[in-house]
């Protein structure tokens, strides 16, 4: 194996720590970088970047590598957070982690690493990279641990980025990663995995969003136009949402609910839960339906835009598989058309709560082909 100078993104978590250890064990020259992507609020009790850096520094000390603290907060605000706010203001539900990977971790961080003389970068993502011997193209593969696979969040990476990237823990299961961390005495071996959006931390999402987006309360209507309550602002809701609707105690209003066809809704009735089905920006109305299988929650087709293809070109029309949300099982689909930065997918089985703003990511078996942002859905 050729030895490289590798710059590892050390987050303070166990996955990136084991990544650095494995690479050093393989004989590479390893340097760690801690990326600060969000400026802590002066009085915030939620942001943990200071502690994360201390954890990363402790890891670097145990492994025996240098670590540098680099601030990418300005780049993050311009390239990721601004788009995040625009999408919410437009009534969509964005996925900032996808954009963060493409613009910060594999662009700003990669550029910085190259200036340091790195030949490769590495992160603790659960994914794999290989070079196809027939085409010479680099491919992004799912991580071997299906419960931790993060290829969905990496689908916007291009050939140049993948050619410089290593994902050592993508070849392992999470249990193996924690075992390795414990065996070599890493101080963060039992550290809890990070969850949620990095710049929000553990604070309530509604509280955070309320600081940046103007909102207007409005009516909550069911599929027959009956008023069930008031929402606090459309930006605070997403399709398929069940919790936090504030319409408990109105179960009798859904009894006998029917689909637009006039047929009773399966699962609707006195005790069926309510779900967000539509956000009508023109009238500032939140539409909810009762029952998990309500037709308004199901769709067979989606249109996507702002597509990015790992091979540099869209896949041919035909059979494929796709995810429309993280941790979803691959769903069989047909690529109806894929031209430029737009594509259309048709699903033989109805998909539940497909959400504009989220990513539709295509797969050919274990190979991630790329994807785009869901723009519209159709029944």
From Swiss-Prot:
It catalyses: S-sulfanyl-L-cysteinyl-[protein] + uridine(34) in tRNA + AH2 + ATP = 2-thiouridine(34) in tRNA + L-cysteinyl-[protein] + A + AMP + diphosphate + H(+). It comes from the Bacteria. The keyword Cytoplasm applies. Keywords: ATP-binding, Cytoplasm, Disulfide bond, Nucleotide-binding, RNA-binding, Transferase, tRNA processing, tRNA-binding. Its EC number is 2.8.1.13. Pfam families: tRNA_Me_trans, tRNA_Me_trans_C, tRNA_Me_trans_M. PANTHER family: MITOCHONDRIAL TRNA-SPECIFIC 2-THIOURIDYLASE 1, TRNA 5-METHYLAMINOMETHYL-2-THIOURIDYLATE -METHYLTRANSFERASE. It is found in: Cytoplasm. GO terms for molecular function: ATP binding; tRNA binding; tRNA-uridine 2-sulfurtransferase activity. Its main location: cytoplasm. ATP binds at residues 9-16, 35, 124. One of its GO terms (biological process) is tRNA wobble position uridine thiolation. This is tRNA-specific 2-thiouridylase MnmA. CDD domains: MnmA_TRMU-like. Gene3D superfamilies: Adenine nucleotide alpha hydrolases-like domains (2.30.30.280), HUPs (3.40.50.620), Translation factors (2.40.30.10). The record marks 125, 358 as: Interaction with tRNA. Belongs to the MnmA/TRMU family. GO terms for cellular component: cytoplasm. Residues 95-97 are annotated as: Interaction with target base in tRNA. Residues 148-150, 325-326 are annotated as: Interaction with tRNA. The keyword Calcium does not apply. Catalyzes the 2-thiolation of uridine at the wobble position (U34) of tRNA, leading to the formation of s(2)U34.
